[in-house]
């Protein structure tokens, strides 16, 4: 490991510290790795979103590439921000092994790009478990080539955030219930 970057937000930073435990490298804070700014969605329980923000919640569920919470960041912006951020990190560290700690939606946006897909295919990209590892190699032209995605084999089953949740699975039977 040659370099560690992290979103300055607490959970990603704690992950970066765990990654860096034995390397002892400086962790470089990178605001471009931050999670989507959820605007009015921030702090609202998922179960309340359909009732409070029906149109925006429907976009999140059905056409996530068009999503933008009131006062928040658009999915398109996150997609472009993550591309620019990771590209800058890779170009600043040619030939080096880099760890970058980020957040679910931001990671999902970057993986969509790294897979060579347009943002409109983001719903086809898996949600990654907390602390899951995705390995992406970059060629001499700094183009990403995913090797593997969402490897959480280091986690015992009880520590997996997704083992006990179903909201991330596709299909109406797994959707969060609307609050009446």
Predicted regions: what they are:
Residues 6-7, 80, 101-102:
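Short beta-strand scaffold positions
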Residues 9, 50, 75, 79-83, ...:
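Amphipathic, non-transmembrane alpha-helical scaffold segments
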Residues 56-77, 170-176:
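Short glycine/proline- and acidic residue-enriched helix-loop micro-motifs
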């Amino acid at each position: 490991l040659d370099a560690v970057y992290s979103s300055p937000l607490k959970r990603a930073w704690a992950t970066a510290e765990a990654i860096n435990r034995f390397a002892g490298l400086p962790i470089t804070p990178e605001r471009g790795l931050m999670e989507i700014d959820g605007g009015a969605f921030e702090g609202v329980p998922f179960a309340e979103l359909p009732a409070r923000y029906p149109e925006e919640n429907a976009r999140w569920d059905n056409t996530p590439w068009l999503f933008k919470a009131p006062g928040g960041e658009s999915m398109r912006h996150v997609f472009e921000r993550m591309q620019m951020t990771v590209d800058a990190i890779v170009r600043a560290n040619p030939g080096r092994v880099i760890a970058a700690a980020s957040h679910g939606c931001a990671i999902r946006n970057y993986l969509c790009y790294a897979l060579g897909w347009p943002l409109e295919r983001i719903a086809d990209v898996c949600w990654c478990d907390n602390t899951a590892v995705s390995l992406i190699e970059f060629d001499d032209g700094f183009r990403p080539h995913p090797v593997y995605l969402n490897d959480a084999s280091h986690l015992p089953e009880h520590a997996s955030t997704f083992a006990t949740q179903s909201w991330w699975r596709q299909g109406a039977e797994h959707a969060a219930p609307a609050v009446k």
